Amino acid sequence: MKLKFIAPLMLLGMMAACQGGKQEANSEQSTETADTTLLEVNFGSKVPDDFYFVEYVNPRFAFHCEYPSFLDKGEAPANGDGRVFSNNELVITVYGEYDELGNADIKKAFAAAKSKTDTLQTQADNWYKICGNDNHGNTYCRKVVEVDGAFATVLATYPTHFANSYAPIVNKVMDTLSPLTPSEE
């Protein structure tokens, strides 16, 4: 599915700048984005004024998500684990992995993934999302979804000073990460 996004919208940037302290939640929080969503872009970042989202499907691990069209698509590994999409500022890594013990447990995975640098920690029945800032001036955001004994992951990183441009885009990518339905497989 291709969606067209238009720029700018200052309100999203101000809302992103106001987020700060650590947040924890144990119930699912979903933010749906309408097809006509306006996103703030271009404060020195490499985000074009007009772009759309492209669907990525991982048949090996039975999940899909959407990524922005302005990112370069890296080569697919021979084993079909995932893909890297980047523009040298925003890097989105999408991959699946099997739980080595064979008992995928999103609660245990969430507990093990938490860090003191996290500013957002959200966990629901079959997924978790963790975001924060590292010591190198970057923002990271990881969403992991449990899919039939495996984990589907989206990891996004970008320079924190481009948060106004990239945070809304990354949130859209994270929101679209989900298992394939039987009709999609």
Model-derived regions: residue spans:
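Proline-anchored loop/turn motifs at beta-strand termini and strand-loop-strand connectors
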Residues: 60-76
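Positively charged n-region of N-terminal signal peptides that target proteins for export
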Residues: 1-5
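Conserved polar/disulfide-associated segments of primarily extracytoplasmic proteins
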Residues: 74-168
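Short, compositionally biased strand/turn segments
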Residues: 34-57, 185
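Coil residues (strongly favoring Ser/Thr
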Residues: 35-37, 119, 176
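Short, low-complexity, disordered segments immediately C-terminal to signal peptides
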Residues: 19-42
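Short, low-complexity, Pro/Ser/Thr/Gly-rich segments in the mature regions of secreted, periplasmic
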Residues: 171-185
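C-terminal motif of bacterial Sec signal peptides marking the signal peptidase cleavage site
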Residues: 14-17
